[in-house]
C-alpha cells in the first residue's frame, strides 16, 4: 500500500479512536530505528550516488518510500555492466526520478516564496529522520490537505506516488495557519489539466513521468 492509499484509508475512517491510536506516540520519527534501510543512511551525505534527495551533500532528505525506490534503482544499476543497455535504461530512470523530485520541490518552494516565506522556504521544506509532526491533532488535516493538493492541483506529476516528506511540510503550514492559502495559490499556479486523472493506483512508470509546464 502506497502513501496515497494509506491516506485515503485513514481519511475515510468514520471514527476518531483509530486516528488517535495512529497519532501515538505524539512525536514519532518518520523512520524508526529498526528501519531496514537505516544501514546506508550514514553514508548518504558523503556519496552523491546515495544522496537520494536532489543535490550532493544535501542532508534534508529522509529514507522515505521514494528514497528507497531510488536507492533500489541505484543498487540494481550498479550490478549491471556499465554502459550496457540495461545500465543505460536504469541510469535514465534514476536521472528522471531525480529531476522530477527536484521539480516538485521547486514548485513547493515557489509557492512558499509567493506567500511571503522567502527566508523560511528552505527550512519549511527540510525533512530529516528526526522530523516530527508538530501537533498530533493536525495529522488528519495534514493528510486531507496533501490529498487535495495531489488531486486538485498539478503540483505533483501524474503517475508519481506521494512522498511522505510533504506530509511534514503540510503539517508545518497548518501550524503557521498558512495551509489553506498555500492550497489556493497552488491551485491557481498549477491547475489540474483537463482530462488528467487523479492518482489512485500509486503506480510509477519511471520511463513516463509527465510533468507538464503550468
From Swiss-Prot:
It comes from Homo sapiens. It comes from the Eukaryota. One of its GO terms (cellular component) is late endosome membrane. This is Melanoregulin. Probably functions as a cargo-recognition protein that couples cytoplasmic vesicles to the transport machinery. Plays a role in hair pigmentation, a process that involves shedding of melanosome-containing vesicles from melanocytes, followed by phagocytosis of the melanosome-containing vesicles by keratinocytes. Functions on melanosomes as receptor for RILP and the complex formed by RILP and DCTN1, and thereby contributes to retrograde melanosome transport from the cell periphery to the center. The keyword Zinc does not apply. Keywords: Cell membrane, Cytoplasmic vesicle, Lipid-binding, Lipoprotein, Lysosome, Membrane, Palmitate, Phosphoprotein, Transport. It is found in: Apical cell membrane; Melanosome membrane; Lysosome membrane; Cytoplasmic vesicle membrane. Expressed in photoreceptor cells (at protein level). A motif (Cholesterol-binding sequence motif) lies at residues 162-172. Identified in a complex with RILP and DCTN1; interacts directly with RILP, but does not interact directly with DCTN1. Interacts with PRPH2. Palmitoylated. Palmitoylation is required to maintain the protein at the melanosome membrane. Its main location: membrane. The gene is MREG. Belongs to the melanoregulin family. The modification Phosphoserine is found at residue 213. It is a peripheral membrane protein; Lipid-anchor. GO terms for biological process: melanocyte differentiation; melanosome localization; melanosome transport; minus-end-directed organelle transport along microtubule; phagosome maturation.
Amino acid at each position: 500500500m502506497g502513501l496515497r492509499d494509506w491516506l485515503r484509508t485513514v481519511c475515510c475512517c468514520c471514527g476518531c479512536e483509530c486516528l488517535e491510536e495512529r497519532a501515538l506516540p505524539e512525536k514519532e520519527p518518520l523512520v524508526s530505528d529498526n528501519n531496514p534501510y537505516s544501514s546506508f543512511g550514514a553514508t548518504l551525505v558523503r556519496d552523491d550516488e546515495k544522496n537520494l534527495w536532489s543535490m550532493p551533500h544535501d542532508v534534508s532528505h529522509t529514507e522515505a518510500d521514494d528514497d528507497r525506490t531510488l536507492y533500489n534503482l541505484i543498487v540494481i544499476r550498479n550490478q549491471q555492466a556499465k554502459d550496457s543497455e540495461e545500465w543505460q535504461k536504469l541510469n535514465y530512470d534514476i536521472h528522471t526520478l531525480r529531476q522530477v523530485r527536484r521539480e516538485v520541490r521547486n514548485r513547493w518552494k515557489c509557492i512558499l516564496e509567493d506567500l511571503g516565506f522567502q527566508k523560511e522556504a528552505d527550512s519549511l521544506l527540510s525533512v530529516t529522520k528526526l522530523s516530527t509532526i508538530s501537533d498530533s491533532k493536525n495529522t488528519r488535516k495534514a493528510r486531507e490537505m496533501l490529498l487535495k493538493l495531489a488531486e486538485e492541483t498539478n503540483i505533483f506529476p501524474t503517475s508519481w506516488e506521494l512522498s511522505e516528506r510533504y506530509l511534514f511540510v503540510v503539517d508545518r503550514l497548518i501550524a503557521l495557519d498558512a495551509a489553506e492559502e498555500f492550497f489556493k495559490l497552488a491551485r491557481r499556479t498549477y491547475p489540474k489539466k483537463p482530462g488528467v486523472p487523479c492518482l489512485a493506483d500509486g503506480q510509477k512508470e519511471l520511463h513516463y513521468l509527465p510533468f507538464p509546464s503550468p
